[in-house]
């Protein structure tokens, strides 16, 4: 594998690892949620993640992030690692799983809007179309998983919506920090900030941990080490190499994977409409991450100045003519995107 293909494959692999582990987090949260309250679970998860990330930072001798990165680290740490974790755990106790999945999946749409407004992210038609298809799939998944018995409270819906807003704000604020600090630094110190925000729940964590079954505690540790420490680092690595909008659209694969993991791990057989929604989610991600091909128009007698081939500008990879005869080859350069 050459250097250029490796630079393209690694961010894609990082994004895949992220969505797989984040999907597994929903299963683990359900397993640990019976023994731990929302705040205690969030604090335990952040502490486990901070220990794992801190050890990795020491091994790699990463050091402190540059001053320019701290604003983004602090904001994303408070919003995403702190506030989001608590309100999501709390909201999932107030509404059924389908309603929670439906409301939280407003997040990627908010990321696209905030990314375009605050970061100047481009909004190509393929990205918009893919997000529309994925959101439709998330709606189908949410409605098919909803209990329909009126068990979803207004408070629960508001909490899940706040989680989506915090998620979007955390992603958009994290992106600039990755311009001056490494993915590991941004994730480690963001996780530490989140742990500090959750410290008011320390008393609950100590009390509940003393009587919680070992399996629930192991689920909490798993949440900290894998969906937090590892997945947030691979997320930051991929985010540093593409736009916030594009990465946000990628997370629409999570509902489909949650359905699959619930089927395999919890023996919850999905309904036909749930499977259809999952397929739509994945199809939308594929569309949003696809790129249009460049078209190179060669005109014999009507060649450009100095006998160069005429290149028709279109959206997609950049093409550059190579000096040489009129019929010479064209080298295609693709931007390093996930």
What are these regions (language model features)?
Residues 1-46, 90, 149-176, 197, ...:
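Glycine-/small-residue-enriched transmembrane alpha-helix faces in small-molecule transporters
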Residues 2-4, 46, 142-145, 216-218, ...:
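C-terminal-most transmembrane helix of multi-pass membrane proteins
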Residues 21, 25-29, 54-104, 140, ...:
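Specific transmembrane alpha-helical segments of multi-pass solute transporters/efflux pumps
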Residues 24-31, 35, 48-66, 90, ...:
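Membrane-interface helix-cap regions at the ends of transmembrane helices
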Residues 34-83, 108-110, 114, 165-173, ...:
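Transmembrane alpha-helices of multi-pass small-molecule transport proteins
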Residues 43-44, 99-106, 173-196, 224-264:
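Helix-helix packing/entry segments at the starts of transmembrane helices
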Residues 53, 111-113, 117, 131, ...:
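Transmembrane alpha-helical segments that form core, pore/gating elements
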Residues 53, 74, 114, 123-145, ...:
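Hydrophobic transmembrane alpha-helices of multi-pass small-molecule transport proteins
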